[in-house]
Regions:
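Juxtadomain coupling helices with adjacent low-complexity linkers
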Residues: 1-22, 31-32, 141-143, 147-191
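Regulatory input/activation interfaces that engage signals or partners
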Residues: 4-12, 23-134
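Conserved binding/catalytic microenvironments
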Residues: 102-108, 133-147, 158
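The N-cap/first-turn positions of alpha helices
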Residues: 196-200
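A cross-family signal for key residues in well-ordered alpha-helices
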Residues: 202, 215, 245
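Short helix-to-turn junction characteristic of helix-turn-helix DNA-binding domains
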Residues: 204-208, 247
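Recognition helix of helix-turn-helix DNA-binding domains
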Residues: 209-242
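Basic, Lys/Arg-enriched C-terminal extension of HTH/homeodomain DNA-binding domains
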Residues: 233-257
Length: 257
């Protein structure tokens, strides 16, 4: 159990608190496990996390300033090839991984299908404990905890002892950071779609045309178009594709298997 005071130290309450919270996360993790932190608030974007003064946390706080150490945040396209962020797309629990496999508390068949070849070169580490953080709007963040010795390839012991604590610390820091740096319009919180609008969007997301959706739901094509257009206005979207994207971000569209 992590004391409330410890969690409070890594929680970002304002932009001015970003730097102290990041430093607290770094120090708490080092004291607890001896590991380093590498944190990103969104594996899909190129912009690194920054403090209130615009300093990049990866270099200024977490110590990834030069050489290979800095590659993971200086070249964000690595997120497209590294097995670490890829695993975070399919897993929500903390895990540890090395070239031999991705080790989770609960078996995950999707992870077993990931390519781990050339692990050291692609992941920029021999082993890592990873805490995925799944946030609103489909945003995926991740915190990786790494040995100071790049040759260490077994983190099973610290994962067994502290994996859940590391995940809680990471979630508290990242989720609060995202809240204080939020740039979306508040109006997005008022978007309420009707049952029929969601049905039409769900089938549209499955690739169905308005005619096909009308046949499935027993509606006229013009009625289907009306419902999709209505959803578009509510979601402040400019076209059908953006409407589907925003509806998916907000969790209105269930997966069609």
């Amino acid at each position: 159990m992590i004391p409330a005071k410890t969690l409070g130290a890594v929680r970002v309450g304002s932009v001015d608190r970003i730097r102290p919270a990041a430093e607290a996360l770094r120090d708490i993790v080092a004291d607890l496990t001896g590991l380093r932190c590498a944190v990103t608030d969104n594996i899909a974007v190129q912009e690194p996390m920054k403090d209130g003064a615009g300093e990049i946390l990866a270099s200024a706080v977490f110590g990834f300033a030069t050489g290979d150490d800095a590659r993971w945040w200086r070249f964000p396209q690595l997120a497209l090839t590294s097995p670490l962020p890829m695993a975070c797309r399919f897993e929500s629990e903390p895990f540890w991984c090395n070239a031999q496999g991705i080790h989770t508390p609960t078996p995950n068949l999707l992870l077993s299908a990931l390519d781990l070849s050339n692990f050291r070169e692609r992941a920029l580490t021999s082993a890592a404990i990873v805490a995925p953080v799944h946030l609103p709007f489909g945003q995926i963040a991740a915190a990786s905890f790494l040995s100071p010795d790049p040759e260490v390839d077994d983190l099973s012991a610290p994962f067994e002892q502290h994996g859940e604590a590391l995940a809680l610390l990471a979630r508290t820091f990242v989720a609060s950071y995202v809240k204080v740096t939020e740039r979306r319009r508040p109006s997005v919180a008022t978007a309420l779609l009707s049952k029929r609008e969601v049905e039409c969007l769900r089938w549209a997301a499955a690739g169905k045309t308005n005619d096909e959706i009308g046949t499935i739901l027993g509606l006229q094509r013009t009625t289907v178009r009306f419902h999709i257009r209505s959803a578009s206005v509510k979601l402040d979207a400019v076209n059908r594709d953006q409407t589907l994207f925003k509806a998916a971000q907000l969790g209105f569209l269930a997966m069609i298997r």
